[in-house]
Amino acid sequence: DCAVFASFSEGQLVTCVQEGVVELQCENDLAEVEREDLSVMPMRRIFQKCANNLAAAGAEPVAAELVIFLPESVEEPELKALMSEAEGIAAELNIQIIGGQTRVSSAVRQPIATATGYGILSEAAVTQASAGKKLAGQDIIITKWIGLEGTADLAARNQEELLTRYPAYLVEEAAAFDRYYSILPEAA
């Protein structure tokens, strides 16, 4: 998910590619077609995953490029809303959108986006990366709880069904777990 190019040095550029099918909140509600497809994710998650992958590699996320493929049925106001959402999310993460592409094609059934994130390596990350491969006995650090993303995703997608078996506060809380996605504070 994350790559460092050339030799390791402080301030080195690191890239991360994160792709996903984007859920559009629009009148055509194209997302309903693939509601059960777990690769379908909101724009927020694409950017957050990119930022998290960069942070996990020891880089500070600074910029991103966004490529969006749209079906012919998507209207310009929906594209503007999608880009506005992307700009807002990037700003929250202190990431500058520095470019990208938008393509419309009859071959596309629902919006697809790929974000390429760029980060700058810190001196500590350079030292760690220069040390070489991960070795037996090294620790794996988990900053959140296992199943966080899946719980939030499934609760949001299946809210109606879950409400028939569980109290509303429990389902709503699980669906809101996306607020914990960022690992940027822990990676700092």
Kindly label every feature range from the protein language model.
Residues D1-A188:
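Helix-biased detector of long, well-ordered alpha-helical tracts
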